[in-house]
């Protein structure tokens, strides 16, 4: 999975449906040392910015997710993105068991979040974000992109 992957939410009735896309979420970046940039946003055309997930208390985000789909949220986020920038990778990729199957998982460093991945083909992965203590899952798709452009 090493490289840059473009993300796309899959509508499922989860509170975060449409939130990441509204805030110009690009996807995720996986490094060869099993570390990852969990939240990668497009700041300007041709410029990707890794965001530190721990600046957003996940329970508060889930409670007020509808605000994240507004024009105001998009504007605020675009101005505050620089302050939210990660200083380095924010998650670790490991093997984890889901429904008795071993699968790749991205464990966030300072959030109770794990993203589980299933390979669709060489260039596409299905993802499921799980927040500890919350029965709802956020589903997304990742498409491999050419690193040369970034």
Segments and roles (model prediction):
Residues 1-150:
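Soluble ligand-binding/transfer domains with enclosed cavities or grooves
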């Amino acid at each position: 999975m090493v490289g840059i992957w473009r993300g796309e939410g899959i509508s499922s009735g989860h509170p975060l449906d449409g939130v990441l896309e509204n805030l110009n979420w690009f996807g995720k970046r996986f490094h060869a040392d099993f570390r990852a940039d969990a939240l990668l946003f497009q700041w300007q055309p041709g410029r990707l910015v890794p965001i530190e997930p721990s600046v957003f208390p996940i329970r508060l985000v889930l409670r007020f997710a509808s605000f994240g789909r507004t024009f105001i949220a998009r504007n605020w986020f675009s101005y505050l993105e620089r302050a939210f920038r990660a200083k380095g990778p924010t998650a670790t990729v490991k093997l984890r068991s889901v429904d008795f199957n071993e699968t790749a998982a991205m464990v966030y460093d300072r959030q109770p979040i794990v993203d589980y991945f299933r390979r669709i083909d060489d260039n596409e992965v299905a993802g499921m974000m799980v927040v500890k203590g919350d029965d709802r899952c956020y589903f997304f798709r990742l498409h491999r992109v050419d690193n040369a452009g970034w």
